[in-house]
Regions:
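Flexible, charged surface loops at secondary-structure boundaries
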Residues: 1-2, 22-27, 51-52, 67-76, ...
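Conserved catalytic-core segment of nucleotide-activated headgroup transferases in glycan assembly
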Residues: 185, 194-233
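Catalytic binding pocket for nucleotide-activated donors in carbohydrate/polymer assembly enzymes
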Residues: 276-308
Length: 308
């Protein structure tokens, strides 16, 4: 039976695949959730119960399990976050999918990203057509982006399809908020905060002690200070002696921003070139304490200029 398969491993990816407008002749529309985030199985159960957009909703603990599924259940069109994968290249050669689109997850979609694999893996990538440049795999049909015009400006010779999402990011965020509150856990306390001065630190893969020191020095400015941990962080002992609360939620932080701003809270966001802040630059105090990052700054400036 013909099917289109949408695979996502984070709530933001699920948010984005719901915003894809794709006309298809496939009889099935299958959503695959990979359990790489907090309370992922609970999220999957809620999606399965409440989101009737899909013919089938599946859950896998690992990409290996998904690869086994795709091998035995070929797709007409595959939607994924990244194309630099020799597994996808092999599967395309074996006709496990006919077309493939990657979709934006954040500002990284606009970066000149290279896969620096060496040796045998690099040779396999080249043989399978995955290549070494994100968005340029030989088997890739195209990309879904929020700012395709920016992408064309950055990469004028790009030859594959560039498609827009159904709705602009901020508009879609408003539309999806009620449903995501039903899907998510641990956000309840944010519904009651009103008129507060709140600091939020969005971590990268590691907790930055210098940012914690900044929060410590500025603690009198805030009624509350929160830390939103990167999903890969398991150890939180570095936060033990600091005046912060860990956000114990799997909800997209962008939805928390909306909730808090709508209730009249003043937000100061500390981060290191985070995608999450890029759409809110004119609505919060933006404290980017990361190292200079020209590609990020260019994308952020483009989006900020469009929202002024």
């Amino acid at each position: 039976m013909s099917r289109d398969v949408y695979v996502c491993s984070k709530p933001l990816q699920y948010f984005n695949v719901r915003n894809i407008d794709y006309e298809s002749t496939a009889r099935e529309k299958v959503l695959v959730i990979i359990g790489f985030f907090r309370d992922a199985h609970s999220f999957f159960e809620k999606v399965k119960q409440l989101d009737d957009s899909w013919t089938e909703v599946l859950y896998f603990d690992s990409m290996f399990q998904f690869d086994r599924y795709l091998f035995t259940h070929p797709a007409e069109t595959l939607f994924a976050e990244i194309d630099v994968s020799f597994i996808y290249g092999i599967f395309h050669k074996l006709s496990r999918f006919k077309r493939m689109y990657v979709f934006e997850e954040g500002f990284g979609a606009y970066r000149n990203r290279m896969d620096d694999s060496k040796g045998l893996k690099r040779k396999i990538n080249q043989w399978t057509g995955a290549g070494d440049h994100v968005g340029y795999a030989k088997f890739l049909t195209g990309q879904y982006l929020y700012k395709p015009d920016l992408y064309r400006q950055l990469y004028p010779d790009y030859a594959k399809e560039l498609r827009s999402f159904r709705r602009p990011f901020m508009e879609r965020l408003r539309e999806e908020l009620p449903m995501f509150l039903n899907f998510s856990t641990g956000h309840e306390e944010f519904l009651t905060l009103r008129g507060k001065s709140i600091g939020i630190y969005i971590t990268n893969h590691e907790i930055n002690e210098k940012i914690l020191a900044t929060l410590e020095a500025e603690r009198e400015r805030f009624d509350l200070i929160y830390v939103k941990l990167h999903p890969h962080i398991q150890e939180t002992i570095a936060l033990k002696d600091h005046p912060v609360k860990i956000i114990q939620s799997n909800i997209m932080v962008e939805f928390l921003f909306i909730l808090l701003l709508d209730n009249g809270n003043k937000l100061t966001i500390f981060h290191e070139s985070s995608t999450s802040i890029i759409w809110f630059q004119n609505l919060v105090e933006n404290r980017n304490l990361g190292k200079p990052f020209e590609e990020y700054d260019g994308v952020a400036a483009y989006i900020q200029s469009e929202t002024l």
